[in-house]
């Protein structure tokens, strides 16, 4: 085993593909994704205003909308056509239309309508701006009601009880900041590292056949395939495991991502993820003992993992056959264990069930 592992280290040292796919590219991926979403939540997204009322109430609504963290009022438009054209040119993500007579309608209790239009081409921007625009339209009606009740001599407590009969106590568990970096970097980066493992494993075995080194390899293992595979995978396992654990240390203890589950699930998850991907790569090469075909299968399996792991769309909402196939993807199990044991801090026994 030791001599086969040394032989593999020599092969890896001479071939720059191993250096790039096992060390350089994973480090680049970690830095890229963690810095790309460093802010956590998108802020100051451009919004337009079509103010046809030009009243004190409409200006107050615009000021309140501009005060939101995720929204920034960048321009005013004369009509809806101009604002729609600005959305089509990607100058703004949304716009709000305040029609003529809004203030008068509020005072006369005629329920005027405020319209807002937003683009869902970018799902995150569309959902966040929809939330802000909906909130500001609700606040507009509440402000008018508050002014009228105050004029009638009602106290602040009576006004708040009338405007909001049921108070909502909202708690976002696990990620109270709605930080997209917490959600995406902890899934995308491990998924890409797993993809590199998927590709390097059949590549390292396939090159033995391609360059006619298989006889020498098996001779060193005394024609024992298990010993040959173990010796060949050992250096790769140690390198990938080091990269994986360094990534987890970086996000959980340097960037301070939430991890109430503690260090033990993090270490176990890293070990299991590396070994599972290597086993899948070995199985793919055994299924298709060709360098080209086995790497194609592994690349397909690794890319599909991003869609079927359940991080962006829940697996239980997919068709039953896809739910069954999803259990064959290591990234699916990585995501479930991360979500249960690391992110939410549930006991590790829950991951077995």
Each model region followed by its residue ranges:
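Long, hydrophobic alpha-helical segments
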Residues: 184-204
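Juxtamembrane interface at the cytosolic side of transmembrane helices
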Residues: 198-229, 233
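Hydrophobic alpha-helical transmembrane segments
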Residues: 124-141, 174-189, 207-220, 240-248, ...
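Extracytoplasmic/periplasmic domains immediately adjacent to an N-terminal transmembrane anchor
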Residues: 1-182
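Membrane-spanning alpha-helical segments of multipass transporters and channels
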Residues: 33, 54, 238, 242, ...
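Alpha-helical transmembrane segments of multi-pass membrane proteins
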Residues: 10-14, 190, 226-239, 243
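Alpha-helical membrane-protein architecture signal
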Residues: 2-6, 182, 221-222, 226-234, ...
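Cytoplasmic juxtamembrane interface segments
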Residues: 110-128, 170-172, 203, 281-303
């Amino acid at each position: 085993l030791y001599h086969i592992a040394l032989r593999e280290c020599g092969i890896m040292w001479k071939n720059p593909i191993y250096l790039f796919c096992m060390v350089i590219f994973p480090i680049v991926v970690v830095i890229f994704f963690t810095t790309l979403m460093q802010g956590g939540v998108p802020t100051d997204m451009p919004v337009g205003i079509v103010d046809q009322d030009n009243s004190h109430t409409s200006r107050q609504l615009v000021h309140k909308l501009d005060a939101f963290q995720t929204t920034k009022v960048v321009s005013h438009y004369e009509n809806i056509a101009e604002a729609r054209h600005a959305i089509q040119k990607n100058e703004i993500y949304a716009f709000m239309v305040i029609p003529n007579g809004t203030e008068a309608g509020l005072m006369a209790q005629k329920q005027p309508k405020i319209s807002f239009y937003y683009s869902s081409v970018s799902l995150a921007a569309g959902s966040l701006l929809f939330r802000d625009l909906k909130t500001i339209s609700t606040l507009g009606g509440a402000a008018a009601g508050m002014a009228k009740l105050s004029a009638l001599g009602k106290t602040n407590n009576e006004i708040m009880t009338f405007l909001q009969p049921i108070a909502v106590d909202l708690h976002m568990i696990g990620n109270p900041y709605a930080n997209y970096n917490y959600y995406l970097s902890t899934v995308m980066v491990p998924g890409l590292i797993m993809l590199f493992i998927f590709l390097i494993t059949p590549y390292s075995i396939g090159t033995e056949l391609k360059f006619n080194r298989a006889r020498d390899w098996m001779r060193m293992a005394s024609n024992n395939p298990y010993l040959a595979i173990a010796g060949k995978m050992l250096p790769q396992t140690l390198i990938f495991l080091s990269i994986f654990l360094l990534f987890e240390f970086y996000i959980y203890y340097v960037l301070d991502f939430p991890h109430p589950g503690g260090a033990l699930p993090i270490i176990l998850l890293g070990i299991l993820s590396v070994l599972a991907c290597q086993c899948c790569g070995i199985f793919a090469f055994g299924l298709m003992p060709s360098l080209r075909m086995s790497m194609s299968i592994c690349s397909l399996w690794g890319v599909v993992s991003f869609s079927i792991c359940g991080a962006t769309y829940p697996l239980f909402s997919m068709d039953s056959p896809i739910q069954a196939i999803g259990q064959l993807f290591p990234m699916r199990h990585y995501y479930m264990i991360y979500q249960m044991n690391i992110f939410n801090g549930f006991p590790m026994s829950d991951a077995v069930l």
